[in-house]
Amino acid sequence: MTLAEVLERIDRERPGESTEEEKLRWLSQVDGQWYREMVLTHEGAEETTFAPYTTDGDKSVALLIAPPYDEVYIHFLYMQIDQRLGEIDRYNNDAALYNQGMLEARQAYNREHMPLQGSRLRNIFPIYNPTRDSNNPLA
């Protein structure tokens, strides 16, 4: 899905409820998070770039989350609009759809892209040895 397709769909389905600047900021949040948490932590990151979307930027650019998971963009924008309008029930429905879509997109990305090997967690705390503890009466 391209940036222009998302903007056109939101304008058609929810006309006048948000400005283009707001929609671009929200889309930048989604793709920025995806880029940091998914793309940069997996092999092949050098093939993908991301810069926040602007009103004077190219609207034909493809968004980072590929089909069939790209509906997350629509649900995220609906979520933001509903939150601002105080439509809590609609917000909750859109949030559930967004979260489910992101979960499925992350799972698919993890299946298709190998995580970077240098990103393992390391134990930075020393191992406790009770025989070396001078305050331990059993030592």
Model-derived regions: residue spans:
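Short secondary-structure subsegments characteristic of cysteine-rich extracellular domains
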Residues: 92-106
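Short helix-capping/linker segments at secondary-structure and domain boundaries
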Residues: 81-91
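Conserved short "hinge" loops at termini or chain/domain junctions
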Residues: 1-63, 107-139
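Extracytoplasmic/periplasmic, Sec-exported soluble proteins
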Residues: 18-22, 69, 90
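Structural motif
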Residues: 62-71
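Short, hydrophobic/amphipathic alpha-helical patches that form generic packing surfaces
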Residues: 71-83
